[in-house]
């Protein structure tokens, strides 16, 4: 039996809807025992503060800067994560001393890969003090210091999952995470690992629904299911410079914008943006060394029926199968949080978090800042 560490992963993604929490035991390599998971939603008021913080973050020139609301926001965000950990431990009947490490992502407020600048607010030292558990945080920065894009970081975890795929899943396999921004991880039959952001995920759909006063997202894709794809609008998105050439890069929330209000009706806009999210995955996958046979989909976007219908139809045209991560034996909601727990253990062990084929860094790079209570 390898030396396993109990780790909690905390993820607050680009959708800014709350905190995902996951517990696993791992050696930081191929031994993974997935345990419990949970989530905690942000209040509408706190979500509004996060969005205001994105505006303040535009002024950042150095990643240590916290202009405007960001200093207080970072403090309050960290305390919310501490509450989430305490509640989770209570629900699971665990004590802080039974957890070896927390992997703390924080909230990305700025990501400019072309400037080697990424900023995630979240005070790891404060979280360690509040929870009484060692914390590893700020896991993207070291990758950027070595010429990487700082994203995506989840591929190391995907590679470990791919080593234990359920029977019947044919490779090459692509793990797709559809959060605010989508990313994919290709695991070749020869073990090749390639990853990059693939395009907008839920982000544009969520913004479109909010623009029309219809909530924060499209539940189940119901609005999109009643609409039709506007091909001209979809074509415009898919001709974006992000998709051109062979050089892949990571994305920021500001790289794509929603159509103007009135350009499309609510349902057609939602359907068009769902199609764009799906088509972006296949378009980005065209840069891979071999055509995928299976797409394993995690993240909130897999719950949008229209997006999944479009993705399934597009993939089937290429002879590929699309499967919800839950139906493949994984946890589609907790996969990113699980990854952050796994990466925290890898960081403590000095193992790489990123590779030249996943972020463009100049060599396999570990990372993260460890702090103790």
From Swiss-Prot:
Reaction catalyzed: 1,6-anhydro-N-acetyl-beta-muramate + ATP + H2O = N-acetyl-D-muramate 6-phosphate + ADP + H(+)
Pfam families: AnmK (PF03702)
Binding locations of ATP: 13-20
InterPro entries (UniProt xref): Anhydro_N_Ac-Mur_kinase (IPR005338), ATPase_NBD (IPR043129)
Pathway(s): Amino-sugar metabolism; 1,6-anhydro-N-acetylmuramate degradation; Cell wall biogenesis; peptidoglycan recycling
Uppermost EC category: transferase
Keywords of the record: ATP-binding, Carbohydrate metabolism, Kinase, Nucleotide-binding, Transferase
Biological process terms in GO annotation: 1,6-anhydro-N-acetyl-beta-muramic acid catabolic process; amino sugar metabolic process; peptidoglycan turnover
Keyword Nucleotide-binding tagged: yes
Documented EC number(s): 2.7.1.170
Superkingdom of this protein's organism: Bacteria
Molecular functions (GO terms): ATP binding; kinase activity; phosphotransferase activity, alcohol group as acceptor
Keyword ATP-binding set for record: yes
Biological role: Catalyzes the specific phosphorylation of 1,6-anhydro-N-acetylmuramic acid (anhMurNAc) with the simultaneous cleavage of the 1,6-anhydro ring, generating MurNAc-6-P. Is required for the utilization of anhMurNAc either imported from the medium or derived from its own cell wall murein, and thus plays a role in cell wall recycling.
NCBIfam families per UniProt: PRK09585.1-5 (NF007141)
Similarity comment text for this entry: Belongs to the anhydro-N-acetylmuramic acid kinase family.
Protein name as it appears in the record: Anhydro-N-acetylmuramic acid kinase
Gene: anmK
